[in-house]
């Protein structure tokens, strides 16, 4: 059996917040409890959104919390580079592979045009409107006319894809409901769906623990794993954290960033203990180091309900 390998792959577009740390901690615990290797990767493929100056502070925050990694941007490893922006040649090879199998086609639709298609069914939550197949039905003449005016994106033809392992009935429904999906944007940027599959496969990731918001992406990724001849990892999706305003934790919750919490004098043990209690690993919040929590980790202990960080809970961080 292959050694367990997990990862945490943040986008360096803002400071880490408690929601990011929740996923990072649980993923790290899963790997360390299983005696595996933990990889840190920066998902900076969308260069306009990414800020290199945030990578160092992100790693400092994770170390401060008590997390470490066996491979990553700061120490390298045999599966690098650990920045997506330095792995573009690998994504191009994957695109070529899919094109050779005739699984991709050019799409000239804009986001506005897709939103205007009232008959389109509800799509995939992480990607927006479902694609109605407009450009898949173009004649050669129509395609040539559009190509003369606009650079296309590349879409994966779902109905031509292979049978994917680990896909249950619910995932099959999600896959069909979302329609054909983009693997390369018109501006040349590789999609998250393709990049994350290539990275996880080539880095030998066996287990992916991530937020529930990415569940909808899983069937598309399973399809790409199958099409590229890769073995898919095991996926676990954990509930999201919500701020006192009832909205999912995001960069707008600046007072819940780790930088802000650290600046207020909070100890890492308090954060770890609170996140452990919220996850269901321990009964009530108590100061703990990340290492002390390793024996407590069991997937079956993890809560399946969304988590609200109310004012009372946040006071425990003071």
Swiss-Prot record:
Q: Cite a single GO MF annotation.
A: glutamate-tRNA ligase activity
Binding-site list for L-glutamate? 7-11, 43, 192, 210
Q: Please give the positions of the paired cysteines in each disulfide bond.
A: none
Q: State one Pfam family annotation.
A: tRNA-synt_1c
Origin, by domain of life? Bacteria
Q: Note the NCBIfam families from the entry.
A: PRK05710.1-3 (NF004314), PRK05710.1-4 (NF004315)
The residue numbers the entry assigns to motif 'HIGH' region are 10-20
Record-listed Zn(2+) binding positions: 107, 109, 131, 135
| Keywords assigned by UniProt, alphabetized | Aminoacyl-tRNA synthetase, ATP-binding, Ligase, Metal-binding, Nucleotide-binding, Zinc
The family line of this record is: Belongs to the class-I aminoacyl-tRNA synthetase family. GluQ subfamily.
InterPro entries according to UniProt = aa-tRNA-synth_I_CS (IPR001412), Glu-Q_tRNA(Asp)_Synthase (IPR022380), Glu/Gln-tRNA-synth (IPR000924), Glu/Gln-tRNA-synth_Ib_cat-dom (IPR020058), GluQ/Sye (IPR049940), Rossmann-like_a/b/a_fold (IPR014729)
- Record PROSITE patterns: AA_TRNA_LIGASE_I
Position of motif 'KMSKS' region?
Answer: 248-252
Q: What is this protein called?
A: Glutamyl-Q tRNA(Asp) synthetase
Q: Which GO terms describe its biological process?
A: glutamyl-tRNA aminoacylation; tRNA modification
One GO CC term, this protein: cytosol
- Which parts of the sequence bind ATP? 251
Recorded source organism is: Shouchella clausii (strain KSM-K16)
Physiological role: Catalyzes the tRNA-independent activation of glutamate in presence of ATP and the subsequent transfer of glutamate onto a tRNA(Asp). Glutamate is transferred on the 2-amino-5-(4,5-dihydroxy-2-cyclopenten-1-yl) moiety of the queuosine in the wobble position of the QUC anticodon.
What is the residue range of the signal peptide feature? none
Required co-factors: Zn(2+)
Q: What EC numbers are recorded for this enzyme?
A: 6.1.1.-
**Cofactor note, please?**
Binds 1 zinc ion per subunit.
């Amino acid at each position: 059996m292959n050694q367990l390998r997990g990862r945490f792959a943040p986008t360096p577009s803002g400071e880490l917040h408690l929601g990011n740390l929740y996923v990072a901690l649980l993923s790290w615990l899963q790997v360390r409890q299983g005696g595996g290797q933990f990889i840190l990767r920066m998902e900076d493929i969308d260069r306009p959104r990414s800020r290199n100056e945030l990578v160092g502070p992100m790693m400092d925050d994770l170390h401060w919390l008590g997390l470490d990694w066996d491979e990553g941007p700061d120490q390298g490893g045999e599966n690098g580079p650990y920045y997506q922006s330095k792995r573009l040649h690998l994504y191009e090879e994957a695109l070529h592979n899919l094109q050779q199998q005739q699984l991709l086609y050019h799409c000239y639709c804009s986001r506005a045009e897709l939103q205007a298609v009232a008959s389109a069914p509800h799509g995939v939550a992480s990607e927006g409107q479902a694609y109605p197949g407009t450009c898949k039905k173009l004649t050669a003449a129509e395609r040539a006319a559009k190509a003369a005016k606009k650079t296309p994106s590349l879409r994966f033809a779902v109905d031509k894809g292979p049978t994917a392992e680990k896909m249950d009935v619910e995932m099959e429904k999600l896959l069909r409901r979302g329609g054909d999906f983009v693997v390369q944007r018109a501006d040349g940027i590789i999609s998250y769906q393709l990049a994350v599959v290539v990275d996880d496969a080539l880095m030998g990731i066996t287990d992916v623990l991530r937020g529930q918001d990415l569940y909808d992406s899983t069937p598309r990724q399973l399809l790409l794993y199958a099409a590229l001849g890769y073995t898919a990892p095991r996926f676990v999706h954990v509930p999201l954290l919500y701020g006192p305003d009832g909205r999912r934790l995001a960069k707008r919750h600046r007072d819940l960033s780790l930088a802000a919490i650290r600046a207020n004098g909070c100890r890492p043990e308090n954060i770890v203990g609170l996140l452990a209690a919220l996850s269901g690993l321990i009964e009530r919040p108590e100061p703990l180091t990340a290492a002390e929590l390793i024996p407590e980790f069991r997937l079956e202990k993890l809560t399946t309900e969304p988590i609200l960080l109310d004012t009372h809970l946040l006071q425990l961080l003071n």
